[in-house]
């Protein structure tokens, strides 16, 4: 992983992670009309309605379920068990954290990805230890930030930075993984997972801005904020927009249900607007109309496709195969994006959104996220190429294995049919 990723991390927050090997029972299947994509071809109803999760490794490459399961287990051992390559570390107080090996800190990004991985893989003990660490060390329990989580801490649990701050994607993955935990394990153990999720959902929408801290979502645009304070409240990070998760919040939240019902389509519009009309590339940060945006005096050019932006393909692909409500737009977006990378011979990592000024080397995280984006492709040859690249990619090692590794890990779960809506 390039050194520049590590430097960029100082100014933003990222991560990706989640796993699962076993099937899940649903509480029922709902009817859903068949969608059509831009070519007029029917799109299978989303997995939320059918409980059918496709293994693209099997479909495109002929890889057996046994081979797939074995690979997922290897990835779990690599990142959660092996002393030389893991990013999961346990502490003496019955807690655990996901370690950003490049920046040598602990982020809500990684903690929430780790929890999602654990609930998907039925690893309750590890899930509880991660959540215990997050609540003990990251949660603000008083003051204007009360209810939010500090976006990064030292491995010893000390919040970093002079001023409190959160990173919105951490709360988003916390909430969704806690809902899944509630549905998978019940609420009678160490935690009432449902109430934990409901509390965060309520807390992050209880800030009126009078003390300088706002709601996690901008109440006018219905979009998740980059950070719920100052000017950042009026901007977003396209990769924080997870319409598939927000669909579930609208169903499961006890509070603000009418508001949450408006957020999935707002997120879908933002992703469509932020995707460049020729290249499909997304910026790291954007205005609410999708225009690339860079905060004043920021440490790098966030108008480029660089660090956070690679996750957008994963968000789009997940929404496509979970719900399929914006199939035509999502097929077009992923066709533009993945054809652009193919024309670049899958060579570079960073670009201006118009495709100019390429730099870096095509990364493991990009390989993963783009394979998830391939769910939305009509071009089966291109989809197969992206999926083959993911299967063949070596497990990330070294100092910068955390970010690319977590995106890679979640992507493997998605593409293998193991990243599921646990109802």
Residue ranges and their predicted role:
Residues 104-111, 160-185:
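Aromatic-rich carbohydrate-recognition surfaces in CAZymes
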Residues 36-74, 81, 104-108, 143-150, ...:
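Extended ligand-binding clefts on enzyme/binding-domain cores
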């Amino acid at each position: 992983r390039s050194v520049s990723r590590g430097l960029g991390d100082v100014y933003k927050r990222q991560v990706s992670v989640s796993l699962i090997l076993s099937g899940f029972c649903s509480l029922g299947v709902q009817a859903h009309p068949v969608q059509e994509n831009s070519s007029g071809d029917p799109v299978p109803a989303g997995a939320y309605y059918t409980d059918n999760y496709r293994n693209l490794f099997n479909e495109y490459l002929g890889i057996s379920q046994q081979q797939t399961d074995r690979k997922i287990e290897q990835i779990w051992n690599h990142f959660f068990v092996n002393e030389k390559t893991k990013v999961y570390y346990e502490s003496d107080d019955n807690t655990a954290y996901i370690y950003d090996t490049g920046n040598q800190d602990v982020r809500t990004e990684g903690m929430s990805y780790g929890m999602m991985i654990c609930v998907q893989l039925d690893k309750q003990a590890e899930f509880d230890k991660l959540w215990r660490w997050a609540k003990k060390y990251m949660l603000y329990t008083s003051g204007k930030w009360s209810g939010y989580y500090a976006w990064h801490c030292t491995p010893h649990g000390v919040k970093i930075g002079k001023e409190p701050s959160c990173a919105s994607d951490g709360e988003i993955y916390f909430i969704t993984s806690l809902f899944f935990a509630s549905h998978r394990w019940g609420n009678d153990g160490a935690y009432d997972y449902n109430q934990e999720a409901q509390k965060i959902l309520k807390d992050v929408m209880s800030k009126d801005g009078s003390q300088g801290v706002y709601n996690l979502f901008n109440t006018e645009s219905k979009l998740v904020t980059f950070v719920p304070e100052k000017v950042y409240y009026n901007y977003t990070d396209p990769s924080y927009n997870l319409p598939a998760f927000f669909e579930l919040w609208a169903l499961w939240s006890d509070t603000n249900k009418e508001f949450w019902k408006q957020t999935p389509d707002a997120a879908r519009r933002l992703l469509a607007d932020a995707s460049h009309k020729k290249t499909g590339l997304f910026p790291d940060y954007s205005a609410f109309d999708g225009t690339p945006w860079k905060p004043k005096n920021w440490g790098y050019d966030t108008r480029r496709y660089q660090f956070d932006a690679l996750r957008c393909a994963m968000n789009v692909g997940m929404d496509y195969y979970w719900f399929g409500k914006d199939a035509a737009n999502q097929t077009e977006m992923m066709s533009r994006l993945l054809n652009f990378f193919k024309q670049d011979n899958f060579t570079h990592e960073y670009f201006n959104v118009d495709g100019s000024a390429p730099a870096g080397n095509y990364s493991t995280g990009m390989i993963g996220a783009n394979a998830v984006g391939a769910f939305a492709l009509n071009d089966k040859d291109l989809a197969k190429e992206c999926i083959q690249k993911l299967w063949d990619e070596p497990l990330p090692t070294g100092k910068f294995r955390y970010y690319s590794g977590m995106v890679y890990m979640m992507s493997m779960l998605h593409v293998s049919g193991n990243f599921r809506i646990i109802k």
